[in-house]
Amino acid sequence: MNSGSKEQQPDAAAVGKKLRVLVVDDEPAVREVVADTIQFAGHEIVGTAKDGAEAVARAEELRPDVVVMDIKMPGMNGVDAMTAILNAKTAKRVLLISGEYRSLGVTRDEMMRQGAAGFMEKPFNVTELFGLLERWAGDRSVH
């Protein structure tokens, strides 16, 4: 076996259904952890962004399958960026993640009504993230 090969990965990669993912967070360390986790699940990180405005521009440029985005960021927050991305149809799904979303006065139900494909609280559950990605990889349609 090649010593440079990766460990066994979750099922989505094994069946060749790879999602193209844009990761957005204002904290570089969080962007890296989220991106590494998604790559471990067998999906492709097509880019990253540090805030909502950059996320909107990167989604337009990259056309990812999924945007995994923090909510509380300087400038344009994740909910506003999600709305812009979904209205422009530059990504199929947006998964919002946050540990501080309550301080913005937005509820989980509101996020889902506004079009979020999912919401995860930080620190996120890796198993739950893998499950969402696997489900979305099996369903390439727009939600």
Predicted regions and their residues:
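Two-component/phosphorelay signaling modules centered on CheY-like receiver
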Residues: 28-47, 114
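Alpha4 helix (beta4-alpha4-beta5 surface) of REC/receiver domains from two-component response regulators
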Residues: 80, 101-120, 131
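Receiver (REC) domain active-site loop signature in two-component systems and cognate sites
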Residues: 73
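Active-site residues of response regulator receiver
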Residues: 70
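Hydrophobic/aromatic residues positioned on beta-strands within the core alpha/beta folds
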Residues: 97-99
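C-terminal output helix
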Residues: 124-134
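Acidic catalytic/metal-coordinating carboxylates
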Residues: 51-54, 77-80
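Conserved phosphotransfer cores of two-component systems
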Residues: 60-62, 85-92, 114
